[in-house]
Amino acid sequence: MNVWKRIAVLGFSLLPSLASAASADVHLEHANIDVGNVQSLQRGAQLFHNYCLSCHSAQYMRYSRMAEDLNLPPDLVVDNLMFAGEKVGETMTVAMPAADAANWFGKAPPDLTLTARQRGVDWLYTYLKSFYVDPSKPLGVNNLVF
C-alpha cells in the first residue's frame, strides 16, 4: 500500500476496529477515497485527532510522518494537533491507562494504526456508516458490521 493510501486511511477513516471479524452477511460499501485530495486528508487527520485519539492510539504513526505525508509544516501540527506537550517525532499514543479504559468501556479501545491494512478500507467505511441508535446497549448505539 503506498504512503498516500495509508495516510488516506489514517486521516479519513480510522475508528474502532475491535477484535471481532466482520459478519459474513454484511455487505461492504466501496470507499471512494481520493488520495490526491490533500485538504480532505488533512481534515481527516484533524477529525481523527479531535475525536478518536482521546481513546484510540495510533502508536505506529509518528506526528512527523503524518506532517510530511500531508504536506503540513511540523509547527502547524504542533500548534493545531498536539495539545499535551508531545514532541513532533513521537508516536500518537493516548494518556488513558488501559486498565481504566477496560473498566469504562468493557475493554481497552484498540490501536487504530493498522486497522485498514488488517480489515480493508471498505470495511472501515462500512463500519463508520453502520452505526444506529440502540437504547438496549450501554452506550446507546450499535453497529451492523459486528
Regions found by a protein language model. Name each.
Residues Q39, D75, R119-D122:
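Generic alpha-helical secondary structure signal
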Residues M1-V35:
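Post-cleavage N-terminal segment of exported redox proteins
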Residues Y51-Q59, Y63, Y132-P135:
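A generic secondary-structure signal for well-formed alpha-helical elements
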Residues W104-F146:
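Thiol/selenol-based redox catalytic cores and closely related redox-interacting motifs
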Residues A22-Q46, S57-E68, V77:
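Electrostatic cytochrome c docking/interface patches
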Residues Q46-A58, V94-A98, A108-R119, W123-T126:
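C-type cytochrome heme c attachment motif
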Residues F12-L15, A19, V78-D79, M96-A101, ...:
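Intrinsically disordered, low-complexity boundary segments flanking structured domains
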Residues M66-N103, K107-P109, T115:
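Structured domain cores in non-transmembrane regions
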